[in-house]
């Protein structure tokens, strides 16, 4: 290898001069880690390892999210204190993260002294700056447990479709959303008692303050993901719309959390102290390691701060969190990276089908965690797209890529090198064109990882692995070994193969760190960094005896995994069913004592009169058309993206293409049926219906006209 070749490869690698703080969302200390959670932690860990391999100063911080009513109630149910519960769950979560190679520099807890102090400090700073408001609000109250009830702890009869045992904020049968006060025959999930209405003073973060809007409009321009930027702009609205609402940051006792300074019996809502937990975990690490915490978090700091999250919590991390930091005297995040959800075999994870797979069950079944790391990485990119774990594809891809292509290279060459050449490579082979091609590809692969385009990085790597295998197939070392006269050619072939394998291992190291560690031991080399692309194997360092690096996925392992999750969750499901049945029975008894349930039954012809109860079943909402496009392959349909006042938009296909161009509709308000059952169409899932008017005889009087409300109507408003 020439000096100029070495110089060019070294120059392509970024110098390790950045200081970077990275977090993943905090898992709630109320349950097990499952493979859906692992998507995020594996994604973050790959990125962190990529940066470390450049030599940057990187801290990967995590913690359990430990506060809130669910923690308090679960602890009570199990006969534990909340502290005992969260300590046990912390141990389980830490075990699972370690099993999957998630390399936190510190994994802590939000129930810590550091978090209490920082949460209070941020709150007081916001209060002093005029961002805290006090208001009396009315809430549901459990008279038996003497506690205010979150929406999800109230059940009753859906006011729209009259389905029983529905939550206090939405119906799982018809999809309607509503206020807890609209629920019919409500009961407390905690005690079964009928809730009463009670007022209480609450504390709000004034997100509606014009200073917040001005700051957030500027901050959002720096987000890396267009989907996140667009979502933020939807939430912010146009200048002057004042769409941001104040955020209730307090909860009443009894509550497991931190008491608000100067407000006895009032506690910080979990979503205030949870993100502060990022800083608390980091401060705990800094104090132990002599790192200047303040230098990392003060305004104007030259350090970088990144948050990896699921797209379902984008709202908290791109509105509340940066605004809290900005106006409490802290630096704001450099960027927030959101990912999509995980499906298994094309469907939502299911306990009944065994696809609600826990991290521990995966390990207990004997599956290699680096198989899952590789599979997720092959599916992940820089967008918020959902990814699917197809179990057949998982087995095929691991067996083909990792065993058939990658590991196979070392196993085909190592034996010959040890037996014939004392395990020492041929130095001249390090200049082979194939080796040079792999070496030159390393900076691009590293760049793909840093851009969070893991799928691209792995596709490039496996394309190179194909070329190496083609080289070995063409050289046929097994035939060369038969004739001593071919010793030089055999030595070169084995040396090229193993140096190529080293470079492929370097390319795969962020994804498969344990395999990379085994490869480093096999070659007798220091831990691989990106700059080591320019440091080939040497005859001065003999390789060790080859140890098998990876086995194939056995279909029986997948079957055992699904069975294990069905079996382990059966008792839980049975217990939950009994509890639900008892609660429902209590609710029915309470309902009979307090009210007569109404059930609407529609009979008769289409033009028969209907009752007001029948009409009330239809959930009509104001919707804003935030995007519109023609549907390829259809001459009738337009695809609408609708803001209906929820945290996420709705996708609706509408047969109005004959009347409107897509650009005519963007920005308009219309009326939609929000509780229509989603319909799977050829072009995708339609999540509702927009309303349009037309003549009875459309041939004689053609035309379609979407309904538009008067000015002043806002997305999410109900049409009554």
From Swiss-Prot:
Domain called tRNA-binding: residue spans: 614-720
Cofactor details (free text): Binds 1 zinc ion per subunit.
Enzyme class: ligase
Function recorded in the entry: Is required not only for elongation of protein synthesis but also for the initiation of all mRNA translation through initiator tRNA(fMet) aminoacylation.
Known partners and oligomeric status: Homodimer.
Binding site for ATP: 351
Keywords: Aminoacyl-tRNA synthetase, ATP-binding, Cytoplasm, Ligase, Metal-binding, Nucleotide-binding, Protein biosynthesis, RNA-binding, tRNA-binding, Zinc
Name this polypeptide is given: Methionine--tRNA ligase
SUPFAM superfamilies, per the entry: Anticodon-binding domain of a subclass of class I aminoacyl-tRNA synthetases (SSF47323), Methionyl-tRNA synthetase (MetRS), Zn-domain (SSF57770), Nucleic acid-binding proteins (SSF50249), Nucleotidylyl transferase (SSF52374)
Compartment annotation: Cytoplasm
Residues annotated as binding Zn(2+): 158, 161, 171, 174
EC number: 6.1.1.10
Intervals of motif 'KMSKS' region: 348-352
Record InterPro entries: aa-tRNA-synth_I_CS, Anticodon_Met, M/V/L/I-tRNA-synth_anticd-bd, Met-tRNA-synth_bsu_C, Met-tRNA_ligase_1, Met-tRNA_synth, Methionyl/Leucyl_tRNA_Synth, MetRS_core
A biological process from GO: methionyl-tRNA aminoacylation
Named cofactor requirement(s): Zn(2+)
Family: Belongs to the class-I aminoacyl-tRNA synthetase family. MetG type 1 subfamily.
Motif ('HIGH' region): 27-37
GO cellular component, one term: cytosol
UniProt GO molecular function: ATP binding; metal ion binding; methionine-tRNA ligase activity; tRNA binding
Catalytic activity: tRNA(Met) + L-methionine + ATP = L-methionyl-tRNA(Met) + AMP + diphosphate
